[in-house]
């Protein structure tokens, strides 16, 4: 009994440490510059989720973003998030930061897959340019959606997760946001959610939710999305994370 109690206490301490680490990884919920306004929120399924996002202002006052989804939950997922955070922090101010982040994450997860740690992470990096086309680079993550009051468009980015090949070349895809356009980055927890009939929401119905939820106010937009999700899903079976990126009026 004493051994069992000690083991339980060790597990609890491990959990609390991982929870503290994970809570310190996510940035504040919003960031902006003279051109863009961004809000990010995560809704973990459990106290230790596997979703991660980060953003920062570059030395040129542009915005660099990372969104990732680590397979699973718990202590291991929290540690993988910490590794992603360290890569982002090390590279964020360097030239070609968007590509270096992707390459370093790929190398990290390639080495992990070759070791005894079997894990997986999808992710994407976005560099928001103030004057020219913005760019996005993807590794198996969900396709971004650009929406405004009158239209909705999906940027299809077919790719595979980090770590499956050693020296991987990442495709850089340009895009442009117009005034009051909002780009929605999200993890797969929303599109894979199930209703009472065990039907998956899917990409098409998620697009309909976005159209019904659209607001130029990012906080309201997010609240609308989550309200529709709660009506659809019987219970939360995965982490949910959203990054809403808006190009400001007259910017």
Predicted regions and their residues:
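Cytochrome P450 core scaffold surrounding the K-helix E-X-X-R motif
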Residues: 146-149, 194-200
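Conserved catalytic-loop aspartate of Hanks-type protein kinases
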Residues: 188
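Divalent-cation-assisted or electrostatically stabilized phosphate/pyrophosphate-binding catalytic cores
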Residues: 200-211
């Amino acid at each position: 009994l004493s051994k069992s109690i000690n083991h339980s206490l060790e597990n609890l301490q491990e959990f609390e440490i991982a929870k503290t680490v994970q809570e310190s990884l996510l940035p504040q919920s919003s960031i902006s510059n003279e051109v863009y306004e961004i809000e990010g929120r995560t809704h973990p399924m459990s106290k230790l989720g596997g979703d991660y996002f980060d953003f920062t202002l570059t030395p040129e006052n542009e915005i660099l973003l990372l969104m990732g989804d680590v397979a699973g939950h718990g202590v291991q997922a929290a540690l993988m998030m910490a590794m992603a955070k360290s890569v982002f922090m090390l590279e964020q101010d360097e030239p070609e930061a968007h590509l270096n982040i992707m390459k370093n994450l790929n190398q990290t997860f390639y080495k992990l897959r070759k070791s005894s740690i079997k894990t997986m992470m999808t992710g994407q990096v976005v560099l928001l340019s103030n004057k020219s086309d913005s760019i996005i680079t993807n590794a198996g993550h969900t396709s971004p959606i650009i929406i405004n009051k009158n239209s909705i468009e999906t940027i299809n980015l077919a790719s595979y997760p980090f770590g499956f090949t050693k020296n991987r070349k990442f495709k850089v895809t340009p895009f442009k946001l117009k005034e009051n356009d909002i780009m929605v980055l999200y993890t797969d927890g929303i599109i894979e959610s199930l209703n009472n009939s065990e039907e998956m929401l899917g990409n098409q119905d998620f697009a309909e939710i976005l159209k019904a939820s659209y607001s130029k106010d990012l906080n309201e937009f997010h609240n609308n999305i989550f309200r529709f999700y709660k009506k659809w899903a019987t219970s939360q079976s995965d982490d949910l994370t959203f990054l809403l990126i808006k190009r400001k009026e007259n910017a």
